[in-house]
């Protein structure tokens, strides 16, 4: 093995060992299911913000997004614009009110439990519908993260993809299984800092190594016309993007309102004061990271010779790090640390997804429906067993090395966003929303995405293929419309439900003394 490879391996070993130590440290502190899933609602602003954003962006930000821009031009940047808009709106209009409402709604620990308590669902319809949607779409989402980890190890060390996939899955499972929510949040905080350092530093160094005057010529030499490639209103071939193309890309913003692994961070923040701090930190981190993720692709076009094939474009950041630190600067250990930044992005999402899926099974299905009188320690044991089971299923889904990270994330993002985004917003801001409307919204959002993306028409194409419109936009609209129509056509909310809504709106009787 080359010395460069040995130093990179040493960096990875230190990093992975550190994550496992954090998990072990928090294992003794995790004594109940509330500790395991929400950390006792004790997150400070910095940890909440960076863990939320790190779990949001995942390996997609450092592999999927740069890969899409690298292969298909800066017209893909509209996705990043949509994500930034969604992040800002989520922190601005959802974070504080959702935290207050989950406290007011019988101290709800999970998103399905919040919806059950918010709508006084005595028959557990919302609980079951929501839990099923989370399990289905999060299995795909978790698989995308594990797949990204496998591809990372495979690209760097040349080890068989399945072996790489196994290593990544075991480490992520290890600290999530041991430490639960607080271990996940603390590791995500560290990983968020590492991601930011890597995404900013590497493209800047590569840009100066290329030289500003050579960028345009090098991009053209890579096989694309630079003026077309750098026009955000064009695709890589110079064709003008249609309105549907741009709407579909901006439509990624809608997903934020329904992402359980992000929303659970809002629920766990220690106070309204910390919510306000988290908003600023989270939005600034997101803006910087997304801008530089796109910059990685543009600089990569000019810096990497020969150009990467489109089916290898998701490796652009990996290739840049290796070239910068193994050849041009000669600091392979530092390069290994920055490669750990990609692993950090992957792990920070996979761990959160494992935890949310496990909470849906153990807390929402087992504890609420099967064994409501089970002791907290038994629920905690079931939670850990569920984490293991979910990881195994996601691992099986991820075994195909040809699966696209961007494609897997896109499908899961649409499913979760359409299922939960509309009902979260309406539950927080529309007083008239009732149980029937909520159930119709979650079910129709999930089904719309499945039909749009997976049910073929007569010619073999899906509606998504035929129209080019992102399924999230369709599913979100269908869900929102049905929530309104069904709520208006059925029984009004009870007086207790209306009082709870007013209390949360006014910031009283909900565990806080101020609005946020």
PLM regions: where:
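A generic transmembrane alpha-helix motif of multi-pass inner-membrane proteins
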Residues: 1-23, 430, 435-516
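Loop-to-helix junctions at membrane interfaces in multi-pass transport proteins
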Residues: 2-5, 38-43, 47, 64-81, ...
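Alpha-helical transmembrane segments of multipass membrane proteins
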Residues: 20, 152, 156, 170-177, ...
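Membrane-helix interface "capping/anchor" motifs
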Residues: 179-188, 428-440
């Amino acid at each position: 093995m080359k010395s460069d490879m040995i130093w990179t391996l040493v960096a990875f070993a230190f990093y992975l060992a550190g994550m496992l130590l954090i998990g072990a440290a928090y294992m003794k502190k995790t004594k109940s299911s509330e500790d395991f899933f929400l950390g006792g609602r004790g997150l400070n602003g910095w940890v909440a913000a960076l863990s939320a954003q790190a779990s949001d962006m995942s390996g997609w930000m450092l592999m999927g997004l740069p890969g899409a821009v690298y292969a298909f031009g800066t017209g893909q940047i509209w996705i990043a614009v949509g994500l930034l808009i969604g992040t800002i709106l989520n922190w601005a209009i959802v974070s504080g009110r959702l935290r207050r409402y989950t406290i007011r709604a019988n101290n709800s620990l999970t998103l399905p439990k919040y919806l059950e308590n918010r709508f006084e669902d005595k028959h557990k319809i919302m609980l079951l519908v929501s839990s099923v949607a989370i399990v289905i779409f999060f299995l795909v989402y978790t698989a995308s993260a594990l797949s990204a980890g496998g591809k990372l190890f495979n690209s760097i060390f040349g080890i068989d993809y399945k072996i790489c996939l196994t290593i990544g899955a075991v480490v992520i499972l290890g600290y999530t299984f041991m430490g639960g929510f607080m271990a996940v949040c603390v590791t995500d905080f560290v990983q968020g800092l590492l991601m930011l350092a890597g995404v900013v530093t590497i493209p800047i160094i590569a840009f100066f190594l290329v030289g500003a005057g050579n960028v345009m010529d090098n991009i053209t030499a890579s096989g694309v016309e630079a003026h077309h490639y750098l026009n955000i209103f064009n695709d890589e071939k110079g064709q003008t993007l249609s309105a549907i193309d741009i709407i579909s890309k901006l439509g990624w913003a809608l997903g934020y309102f329904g992402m359980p692994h992000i929303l659970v961070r809002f629920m766990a923040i220690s106070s309204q004061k910390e919510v306000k701090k988290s908003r600023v930190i989270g939005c600034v981190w997101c803006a910087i990271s997304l801008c530089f993720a796109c910059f990685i692709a543009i600089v990569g076009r000019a810096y990497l010779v020969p150009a990467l094939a489109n089916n290898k474009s998701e490796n652009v950041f990996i290739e840049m790090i290796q070239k910068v630190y193994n050849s041009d600067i000669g600091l392979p250990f530092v390069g290994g640390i920055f490669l750990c930044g990609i692993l950090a992005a992957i792990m920070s999402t996979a761990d959160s997804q494992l935890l949310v899926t496990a909470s849906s099974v153990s807390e929402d299905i087992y504890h609420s429906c099967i064994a409501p009188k089970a002791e907290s320690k038994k629920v905690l044991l079931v939670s850990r067993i569920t984490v293991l089971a979910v990881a195994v299923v996601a691992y099986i889904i991820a075994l195909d090395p040809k699966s696209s990270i961007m494609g897997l994330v896109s499908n899961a993002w649409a499913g979760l966003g359409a299922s939960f985004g509309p009902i979260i917003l309406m539950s927080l801001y529309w007083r008239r929303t009732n149980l029937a409307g909520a159930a119709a919204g979650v079910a129709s959002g999930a089904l719309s995405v499945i039909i749009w993306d997976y049910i073929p028409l007569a010619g073999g194409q899906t509606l998504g293929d035929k129209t080019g419109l992102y399924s999230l936009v369709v599913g979100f609209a269908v869900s929102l419309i049905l929530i309104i129509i069904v709520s208006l056509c059925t029984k009004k909310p009870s007086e207790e439900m209306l009082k709870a809504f007013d209390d949360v709106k006014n910031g009283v009787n909900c565990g806080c003394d101020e609005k946020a």
